[in-house]
Regions:
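Primarily low-complexity, compositionally biased regions used by nucleic-acid-associated proteins
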Residues: 1-11, 15, 19
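Chalcogenol-based redox active-site neighborhoods
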Residues: 2-4, 25-208
Length: 208
């Protein structure tokens, strides 16, 4: 009788262990499967800087979608957002820093382009302080573009253009976003090599 009880107890214990082990194994598998699934969902966006891969925080808004809610700081240190650009077509010329040759060239080129556009504002956007942006445009005599800084706003995160790795981590990638007077995205370009200039023609054609 005692032996029978002992056997029953041992069987119960073994069964318990087996269930526990099986549950643990299944749980581990489920966690692993979920992690794998999630890693597939989040595909990293990358560009290059001098041929070296660097990560970008997200993806540009889709053509046809509404421009995400954003904020930028102007030369007077006031903030602007979606409501401030409503009613005008806008080209956002986005880049790392006004103090680099390619960024300076793109600002000059878009200044020239802006002179021939109607009902269109061209914003040159970087993480530079507004004073640096204003100083550059003032010394170069660039009066057709507007400058705006992302240094204390959500702009980079909202549009998915923050550089998240590499030597320029923390500033913006090189990109162009064009929107119509109602805030609908007409064209986007994430320049694959930061040292290269954007496709100016594609930006202009999006407004035709």
């Amino acid at each position: 009788m005692a032996a029978k009880k002992k056997t029953k107890k041992a069987t119960k214990k073994t069964a318990k262990k087996a269930v526990k082990k099986s549950t643990k194994k299944t749980s581990k598998k489920a966690v692993k499967k979920t992690a794998k699934k999630n890693s597939k969902k989040v595909s990293k966006t990358t560009v290059t800087l001098g041929g070296n891969k660097v990560s970008v925080s997200g993806k540009l808004p889709k053509v046809g979608s509404r421009l995400p809610k954003f904020a930028l700081t102007t030369g007077t240190l006031s903030e602007i957002g979606n409501a401030d650009i409503k009613g005008k077509r806008v080209i956002f010329n986005i880049f790392p820093s006004i103090d680099t040759p390619t960024c300076a060239t793109s600002t000059r080129t878009f200044n020239e382009i802006a002179s021939g556009l109607t009902n269109t504002d061209v914003y040159c956007v970087s993480a530079d302080l507004p004073f640096a942006q204003g100083r550059f445009c003032g010394s170069e005599g660039l009066a057709n573009v507007k400058t705006a800084s992302s240094f204390r706003t959500n702009f980079g995160a909202a549009l998915g253009v923050n550089l998240t790795s590499g030597v320029l981590k923390g500033v913006l990638a090189r990109a162009v976003v064009v929107v119509d007077a109602n805030g609908k995205v007409l064209h986007t370009e994430l320049v694959s090599e930061i040292a290269n200039e954007p496709n100016y023609s594609a930006a202009i054609n999006a407004l035709k």
